[in-house]
Amino acid sequence: MLLSRKLLNTLFPIFNKVSNQELETMLNSIGVEVENIIKFPRTENLIVGEIKKVEKHPNADKLNICEVFFENKIHVIICGAQNVRPGLKVIVAKVGTKMLDGRLIEAKDLLGVKSNGMICAYAELTTKTDVCSYDEIENIIELDNDAKLNDIDPLKYIGLDDEILDLSVPSNRNELNGVIPIAYDLISLYFPKSKIDFSLKNIENQKKTSIKINIDKELCRFFGVIDVSNVEIKTSNWKIKSFLLNCGITPINTIVDITNLNAIITSVPCHAYDKDKLGKEIAVSLNAHKEKFLALNDKEYVVENKSAVSVISNNKIVSLASVIGSKENSISNSTKNVLFEIGNFDNMAIRDASNKLGIKTNASTLGSKTIPLWITYKSFDYLIGLLKDLNIKVSSVNYVGDKLKDNLIDFDSQTIQDLLGQKTDVEKNLKLMGFNFVGKKVKAPVYREDLENISDLVEELTKKINVNNLELKPIESSFVDFEFDNFEENWNFLEKYFINKGFTLVKTLNLTSLENNKAFNLFGSKKSIKIMNPISSEREYFRNNLIQQHLEVLSNNYAHKINLYNIFEIQGLNYDGLWNKHLCLTLPIEHFNNKINNSKIVIDLLFIKSILTDLFNVFNIPFEIKAIENLSNDIEFISTNNGFEIYVKNKLIGIASQISPEILNKYKLDSSKPIYFVELIINDLLDSKISKSITVSDEKKEHNIARSITLSLDRNQNYKKIESVLDNYKNNLNLLDKFEIESVFIKDNKPSYTFSLEINPSKLNKKETNEINEIVERLIKDLINEGAEIKR
């Protein structure tokens, strides 16, 4: 699904102050993944002008001499578009404008007449022309009347100031292909004090149309028609056209565009007929006999007997329900009276008809999955209101449908808390999310047919538990009463901390397969929690780790030739009856550290140790590093010889390692390039007080560079010689601000020492990574000469 930020903000102004990053996090929390954010390239030096006069060019039949008024004077511009006429407000590229295709607009002579600028067509201002009609490509833009003369930001009038989110929607939430259902979910979760209006006011008190409706209730849960008379078929205004173009739909005319816009907003397919070509009765059933059908795509299909849910009038198929309409009954320039249709049809029958006939449309994609009945009623109601807003008079309506019923779910607070693994006021939180209580049952929001049992309620509460504080208003209450005084503050601090260090924040899904939980069971989880109605076997258990889905993220990006980044995630995971908070860093590339002259740092365990040293120092928590010894034999993705375990108070809280090449091959990543990760259980960090006064901001300053060196000695080796080498570097090189033993551990009867050092970049000559590495390599060489074995 393509979600227009501008459309979302227009319909629900509460999202105006939500950034794209915040919105992405919010969408992830309801199971919607943001695949990409599309921003339109901008052409500068544009202005809104008004055509005052048009004359034919004396030396060219297809060119027009236009007098265009802007900046308080008339400018002569030669234009070949056939729709130029006096009174139009247009977008002008002034002399000196560089167009997206590289052309430079110059004042030049065209067959004896000097042209001073260019009047723009839509296709000249965007790189996304695949859904443009002839009008957007060949004709100049005819701006709506509200465009202001001399406005130097005219792109907003044609939607090119929009941002488009390419979304992947859960298969069991088909309604989330509409703007309204997405907004309902987000508002109930993030803006609990903002009331959602679930009324269907527009349906009420409408005159009933004379057209009779008969439906097969096994195939159709709702069928409604809206009768509109004396319409004018013309090009839509730019408010409608821009939303369609930005969502990948070609504008056609006012009526057809309204049906497509309504589907974008509500997720329900909509169709329009030339009413004068229909009979006085409409039926919905399987087609009664074999029939040839000329569709809107100008292709003829043979519809076999009883093979497709059909809308029938005058004993003919007038549309294949939620697939495609007939050419014979379609809207044309001569249409005067229109009948709009919205239905809720059997999704399996829609899918079968679409597959058998080989017809794939936006409608069939939506119709082949379940759409909640209330959403269909809402779509019908919204369409009536939309027509009124566009000054299109509704003559009458008629509909037949199943009665809307409350979705009541058995409720047990203690069972829910046991599944959550955390104490919380379940009833209060569910009420804030739009649920109500009827006796011992909980009533789901009217549009949530997908919720069936306690496990579904747990999943809804889990979304809120995993919601990070985005500091959005009017959020004033927390859904979960965390025991940690510093929890939210520290969680937010950690996100900003790692973003400031050059990592990219990701959010991944909380459900996975049992196989993945076993293969990536870093911390010896004994019990994976299974949900009762999983979408698939790949998403039926709460996960016990983050790294597995990080590999999926990298694999997906690599397959689509998207640049890889060093990523991190902070998330709560539900396993072993506890709610454990995890932090995972995954590092597939050299780390870009623009604090020091755009240098790059090679990723290895030394770098990870330096990151951990900084992190734990911030929280004043001592930690210890040990060799990897406690992993299950099922954990094959870790290179045990190139990794370590992290302990706090003798308790394993983390693992850092290179990922094995075999696993990289499995995920179709480049196994010739090492990928490292570190995953921590950060309950203690979130419960701690930050010990240092640290400000995390976007400002890039020079910070000390941390490095760690681990060496081991035989029992009979003289540590004094090693100490003298270290003292020499510590005392004689004034660029070291810190040099101390970080940890000591024993493996294979050999003592191992980890030293941490901090280099002050302001004392370097070239301030380059090479100089830093040379110092470290020189130190390592001297240590090796004294018999030390360096752990790389």
From Swiss-Prot:
The keyword Ligase appears for this protein: yes
InterPro entries: aa-tRNA-synth_II/BPL/LPL (IPR045864), B3/B4_tRNA-bd (IPR005146), DNA-bd_dom_put_sf (IPR009061), NA-bd_OB-fold (IPR012340), Phe-tRNA-ligase_IIc_bsu (IPR045060), Phe-tRNA-ligase_IIc_bsu_bact (IPR004532), Phe-tRNA_synthase-like_B3/B4 (IPR020825), PheRS_beta_core (IPR041616)
Residues in tRNA-binding domain copies: 40-156
Cofactor(s) named in the record: Mg(2+)
Superkingdom assignment: Bacteria
Stretches assigned to the B5 domain: 404-472
Chain sites annotated for binding Mg(2+): 450, 456, 459-460
Homology family: Belongs to the phenylalanyl-tRNA synthetase beta subunit family. Type 1 subfamily.
Record note on quaternary structure: Tetramer of two alpha and two beta subunits.
Protein name per the record: Phenylalanine--tRNA ligase beta subunit
Organism (species): Malacoplasma penetrans (strain HF-2)
Biological classification of the source: Bacteria, Bacillati, Mycoplasmatota, Mycoplasmoidales, Mycoplasmoidaceae
